[in-house]
Regions:
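Secretory targeting and sorting signals
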Residues: 1-34
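Extracellular glycan-recognition surfaces and repeat-rich motifs
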Residues: 36-84
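A carbohydrate-recognition surface predominantly in extracellular/luminal proteins
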Residues: 39-49, 118-130
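Solvent-exposed strand-to-loop "edge" motifs in beta-rich extracellular domains
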Residues: 87-91, 126-140, 150
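Extracellular/lumenal carbohydrate-interaction signature centered on repeated Trp-anchored short motifs
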Residues: 108-123, 213-216
């Protein structure tokens, strides 16, 4: 009797262990879990540090908060969505390269791939800016939104450039900002001089950049989308509520949630 019981018990334990492994595997494959409100969508989470666009030892980490700074109350005292955000830390003069500053992109190389640049209509984010960051690099020492693209320009044998949004100064420091609209503030430029009228020395609006890329060819397509910082000044802060068209990307410690924009 005891032998039979021991054998049965062993089989039960083995089945339970196998079930736990399967459950763990499937729960780990989807970290952007719907919260059951505000139109959250459950989907595979393809967000993370884009390693080939990273220099030095920067930090881009899904974190709780920031909450504050101390003494700050009301909506600006916590992330605009949920409890978390994307924490970013980059240093200057910290590598053996020239310049010596760090760079990081936290982005998605899957879900936007092949989307038309002409379809970008609403872009922006919320930022937690600090007075220290302003001291490090001035009022406009801010993170960026970057889209790697294939310009597909007629007569130009080049299939790579990066669209970069440079925000204006944050309207507040040491607390969360409201939504900063990348279609009406700051400026955009293209790397690589694909469109000279929208390079880093010739600032463009998003509308002007889209128009410059619309030269009658196949049309520019997106390769990746990211929030990043560098290479310029030290910056330690956070971003949340990245908006791309009608989707808001809510950065949480458990992953990146998607919400429908109102």
């Amino acid at each position: 009797m005891s032998t039979r019981f021991g054998g049965t018990r062993g089989k039960v334990l083995a089945v339970a262990a196998l079930a736990a492994i399967v459950a763990s595997t499937f729960s780990g494959s989807v970290s952007a879990v719907a919260g059951g409100h505000d139109g959250d969508q459950a989907r595979p989470d393809h967000w993370g540090v884009i390693t080939r666009n990273t220099i030095g030892s920067p930090v881009a980490d899904l974190r709780n908060g920031p909450f504050g700074s101390f003494g700050v109350t009301g909506p600006s005292a916590s992330p605009p969505y949920g409890q978390g955000s994307l924490g970013i830390e980059v240093a200057d003069e910290s590598t053996s390269l020239n310049p010596g500053s760090e760079k990081v992109d936290f982005g998605n190389e899957v879900d936007f791939y092949g989307d038309p640049v002409q379809g970008l209509r609403r872009v922006g984010f919320h930022v937690f800016q600090t007075g220290e960051n302003v001291a490090y690099g001035g009022d406009e020492n801010m993170p960026n939104i970057r889209f790697e693209i294939d310009p597909n320009l007629t007569g130009l044998n080049d299939n790579y450039s990066t669209m970069v949004w440079v925000p204006d100064a944050s309207p507040v420091t040491n607390r969360w900002s409201g939504f900063i609209d990348a279609t009406t503030s700051g400026y955009w430029f293209l790397t690589g001089n694909e469109v000279p009228i929208c390079n880093q020395a010739a600032e463009c609006s998003l509308e002007e950049l889209r128009t410059a890329l619309n030269d009658g060819g196949q049309g520019a397509t997106i390769l990746s989308a990211a929030v990043g910082k560098g290479r310029d000044h030290m910056w330690i802060g956070a971003v949340d509520g990245l908006r791309i068209n009608q989707t808001i990307y809510d950065f949480e410690t458990s992953g990146v949630r998607t919400r429908r924009a109102g």
